């Protein structure tokens, strides 16, 4: 039995379910409704993530959404990590899938950047620092938030592999692929030169 499976299938499945249950909580939708702003899915991109919440003009609400979406990746991983590395990775996968495909919203969720960050914080804070450096550097230089996130996410499994975290690297290879898939519209706009830049009005 490999170390990742040492906890046994019941623990892995329980961790996956725990992660999904946390990840599927649509904080962006909940917070905007509680704030009296209606359904965030009816504005902007229709996404439930922090970037679209920011389009309501409420920066504090967007920041709260970002924090909550990150924590729903961090907390289940830390909890499941008490059972071993395998359950921690399963919880991370579950949280990310829950955010992208929440059952409560017809499996139409966010794009996953905040939850990606949250899972990474729990599993490799050092790699998160590298992710942040790449994201901030590219965002500052090119003014494309989506491109910065895509590049940082693609670099993440490579960095993890270089640090000797093979199992975590494999997980983030899957997460990065899903994140890129969810960003397909952004990628098309980047290719066409129509993607909005950071700070751009209208």
Swiss-Prot record:
UniProt keyword Metal-binding, yes or no: no
Catalytic function, reaction form: an acyl phosphate + sn-glycerol 3-phosphate = a 1-acyl-sn-glycero-3-phosphate + phosphate
Residue ranges of the TM segments: 11-31, 87-107, 116-136, 158-178
Function: Catalyzes the transfer of an acyl group from acyl-phosphate (acyl-PO(4)) to glycerol-3-phosphate (G3P) to form lysophosphatidic acid (LPA). This enzyme utilizes acyl-phosphate as fatty acyl donor, but not acyl-CoA or acyl-ACP.
Annotated family: Belongs to the PlsY family.
Subunit: Probably interacts with PlsX.
Name this polypeptide is given: Glycerol-3-phosphate acyltransferase
Organism per entry: Methylorubrum populi (strain ATCC BAA-705 / NCIMB 13946 / BJ001)
Highest classification ranks of the organism: Bacteria, Pseudomonadati, Pseudomonadota, Alphaproteobacteria, Hyphomicrobiales
Designated gene of the protein: plsY
């Amino acid at each position: 039995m490999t170390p990742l499976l040492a906890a046994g299938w019941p623990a892995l499945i329980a961790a996956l379910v725990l992660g999904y249950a946390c990840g599927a909580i649509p904080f962006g939708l909940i917070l905007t409704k509680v704030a009296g702003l209606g359904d965030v899915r009816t504005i902007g991109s229709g996404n439930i993530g922090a970037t679209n919440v920011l389009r309501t003009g409420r920066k504090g609400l967007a920041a709260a959404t970002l924090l909550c979406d990150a924590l729903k990746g961090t907390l289940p991983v830390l909890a499941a990590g008490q059972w071993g590395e395998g359950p921690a990775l399963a919880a991370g996968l579950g949280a990310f899938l829950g955010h992208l495909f929440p059952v409560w919203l017809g499996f139409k969720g966010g794009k996953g950047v905040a939850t990606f960050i949250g899972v990474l914080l729990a599993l490799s804070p050092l790699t998160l620092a590298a992710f942040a450096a790449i994201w901030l550097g590219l965002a500052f230089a090119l003014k494309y938030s989506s491109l910065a996130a895509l590049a940082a996410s693609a670099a993440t499994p490579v960095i993890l592999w270089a640090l000797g975290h093979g199992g975590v690297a494999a997980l983030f290879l899957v997460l990065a692929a899903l994140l890129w898939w969810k960003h397909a519209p952004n990628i098309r706009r980047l290719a066409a030169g129509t993607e909005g830049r950071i700070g751009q009005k209208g």
